[in-house]
Amino acid sequence: MIRSSTGRVAAIAIIFLFIVALFQNNDTGTYAFLPSLSQSSKLPSYPPTWLRERMALSEKSWKKSVELREKMAQSHPANPKIPFFPTDFLKYPFTIWDFFPATWTCPHDFQRVGRLGDGGKWVCGMSIYESLPEPKPISAEAVEVREAAIAAAESGLVIYSFGINGESSFEAEMLERVPSARIWGYDFSVDGWGKQIPMTERHRTFFKKVGLGKDDEHDASPAFWTLPALMKENNHTYIDILKIDIEGSEYDALDTFMDAFDGIQSASGKSVLPIGQVMIELHLGNGDSANEKVDFDRFRKWWERLERMGMRPAWIEINLFAVTLGSNKSNPRCTEYVWVNAKDERSVLWKQ
């Protein structure tokens, strides 16, 4: 009886384990007995299947918008010198921003970070960033030396912020919600971060009173640095999040950045910008003067080079302050975009 009972119990246990193993499935949808052993024998797919499928749908939507962009541009007789804000609506029912819609959908959550008005930003995959483990504590020496890069430069989530102007609600919330976040800030017009960042979090930030520019002019007043030079100074090869609002200087500054990585193997891939995502405010004139530095042709070539190097428009928010403030009303010449790097091989967004 004892032997018989023991045998029945063992048989039931074996059957139970088999059923549990049967319902354990891997990312590709196949089943495996003892899945922990079978999965350890091969690397997981990258990105996961569900994520690749969502990204493929986004890429398809974006490519369609690129085709429509070309057709719409060809329909205007002044192409490539198309006015930013045509006055004949019946003939040309579009503005500059309609050529560059946010057609690439973030496959993760999209959350507002920072205040709801000017200064706050939309972030693709905020929950992914929140889930990242906190890096090792920063040494006391690194905290004291504020004109030196933070120790263990690339540990944690690396954020660069250009154009602070005394408003740091975005940075403050990122520090509060993302334990791994480390932020490097630059602005030649202010002396430091806004009051929104509490002193208890300042040890995770670094500030330098310089501007972001096309050329390195470190001895000028004010001083300007290029983005590649700042990354080298900080011992960085990759930026997870780039926030940039530099009042029209973004075109030349990002040209220099693209020059540094076009045709080069970076942390993200060949001819791919080593940035996970970008929150940027774009500034334009009215686009109707021969003296303007950025016209439609210049803007489109600049934009499409960014796309070629991985960037995809995932969010757009028209800044209406120029339209609504004051007595001298203006066209909507400033617009916030979120670009997500769809080609980036290093982004934490594609590993979840």
Predicted features, each with a name:
Residues 132-151, 230-235, 260-271:
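Alpha-helix termini
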Residues 29-128, 132-139:
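N-terminal accessory regions of S-adenosyl-L-methionine
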Residues 179-181, 232-242, 248-352:
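Conserved acidic-Pro-Pro-aromatic motif
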Residues 104-221:
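SAM cofactor-binding core of SAM-dependent methyltransferases
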